């Protein structure tokens, strides 16, 4: 059984899987809007066979403190990654981020370039997009007009392909009950969504010189693949992985395909 270390820094719950980490490359995983480090369960075996892996719950979510600083932005998310690295004594880490977590990784590359080794951005974006805004507006209406139960019940529609939702109905209903019980305060979720809607680093993409893997699903119903294509085309040192099926959360629906590309990228020169 691999060693796991659990800790808290400035209200952020984190877990280190594997160790010791001295002299080793480390992978830091950053989740999407939901914020839970448990999102990465389908990647853990493939990664921990090779590297120590850090997961954490975003500020305001999961087991982390359930409040956010005023005027919350993606810069705060990037700063929180640095706090987790500092707590573990890491000079830098490979960062793998899904959507919001990938965007925070891009912000980290700009704000703290020396703390980032390689970066993987899954279904992310660099500037506001009309379709993303439409989806988030719908989520906001569900949350504000109906409540967390309706918000959570609708999430699979944004995240997964229809056939996968049908096949995994029992699993999704069990997860739904858990997500409703653990749902963040309304003001936290509103602030996180508004931070993502305000995120715009498009004019600075050429300043990010790190090795980056942009990974995208063609059938993502939340983030158009054109957003990932734009990232891959404008980042000076980016690789691009496109999968045909799997939805916004294809790291969950087709982990084998994603994990193979992820490991290959992180192991490469």
Curated annotation (Swiss-Prot):
A GO BP annotation: nitrogen utilization
InterPro entries documented for this protein: AB_hydrolase, AB_hydrolase_1, AB_hydrolase_fold, Pyrimidine_utilisation_RutD
Keyword flag Transmembrane: no
Enzyme class, first EC level, given as a word: hydrolase
UniProt KW keywords: Hydrolase
SUPFAM superfamilies: alpha/beta-Hydrolases (SSF53474)
Summary of the function given for this chain in its UniProt record: Involved in pyrimidine catabolism. May facilitate the hydrolysis of carbamate, a reaction that can also occur spontaneously.
Domain AB hydrolase-1, residue spans: 26-144
EC number(s) per entry: 3.5.1.-
GO MF: hydrolase activity, acting on carbon-nitrogen (but not peptide) bonds, in linear amides
Catalytic reaction equation(s): carbamate + 2 H(+) = NH4(+) + CO2
Record-stated family: Belongs to the AB hydrolase superfamily. Hydrolase RutD family.
Organism: Caulobacter vibrioides (strain NA1000 / CB15N) (Caulobacter crescentus)
Protein name: Putative carbamate hydrolase RutD
